[in-house]
């Protein structure tokens, strides 16, 4: 794949937040002029092979009309509640011949039952919806940020989970293997591909595509070693370098003059793809939602 796009978009975009608390009003989500086809055309013209969408970030808001929660696009002004950003982007990818993938945050700061076994069942039902309604996906992205404070149905407290066991990830792997056997599974330790241990877009000058099986898990405390891999590893888990074209992952107007330059992006390419990894470059969608800049300029959604 070499290079592919990340798109962070959701309620955070309209509320100037990075990590939504889970209490933002869905009525604030109204991308009246959104054009997913133009995003994809620009990605294609820039040589990217695919795109990963934040279908649900930590705030719990869903960009598809899930039947599992009211905290979703069905209850927004967008297309009078009949919109589906996941479908619009996946259809655009099919039309222009690049691959589509989804990010699904395991952590959910909106759901009242987060931290209980019932939430895990809810999470897997969401995953099943995404795996069965939108065609082929090339990657499933599980974020390592899990547990902490949140709205949690109005409780407004902090919740701690056992990151090694709470989500029962082998259950996810089995579901994905059955429903989307071609999909690569991303998490801190894979099993398909791994986090590189930083969000700066680079891997170590020596970067092994191996980890010691069973050692790395979401929230792994020695994450900085992931930029190098394990020279004595026995499981193939290639590195993926994720980085945003702006300081933040979601759009913030005060960062309009902080877009990475062509020289900076070129350096990131050499320090990621050139260091035996792939480059996942994030584009924060802004409030105008009109277009992505031409690929001959620094790439950003403007």
PLM regions and their residue ranges:
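Mature catalytic domains of secreted/periplasmic carbohydrate-active enzymes
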Residues: 1-293, 297
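Hydrophobic alpha-helical segments, chiefly the membrane-spanning helices
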Residues: 301-302
